[in-house]
Amino acid sequence: MARTQNPVVIIDTLRTPIGKRNGGLSTLHPTDLLGLVQKAIVERTGIDPSKIEQVVGGNVSQVGAQSFNVTRTVWLSAGLPLTTACTTVDTQCGS
């Protein structure tokens, strides 16, 4: 397998607060919550969004309206570059 000239670099990570059923975050749609995280990382790092090639976001129990690629939808609705690849991972607890 050939080595790539462009290594993968993780610039920053950030997570949302842990919520509970009918808690303070229950009225906030998952895309709005993830949008706050994505925007905060772009602002915090000062990176040019056009330089970001891949975004990975996590979401628990994607059903119904959430069953699409939430990370991609959030990225685009925030007005960030169409050229950025986005992936949503189902991040259920293993306990």
Set out the residue ranges of the language-model regions.
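Short, flexible, glycine/charge-rich loop motifs used to bind or transfer phosphoryl groups or to couple energy/partner
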Residues: M1, T45, G64
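Condensing-enzyme catalytic core mediating Claisen C-C bond formation in acyl metabolism
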Residues: M1-T31, A40
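Conserved beta-strand elements of the Class I
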Residues: V9, E53-V56
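Short, well-ordered amphipathic alpha-helical segments that serve as non-catalytic structural scaffolds
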Residues: T31-G46, V70-V74
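Short acidic capping loops at alpha-helix termini that bridge into adjacent secondary structure
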Residues: D48-Q54, T83-A85
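Conserved catalytic cysteine-centered active-site region
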Residues: N59-S95
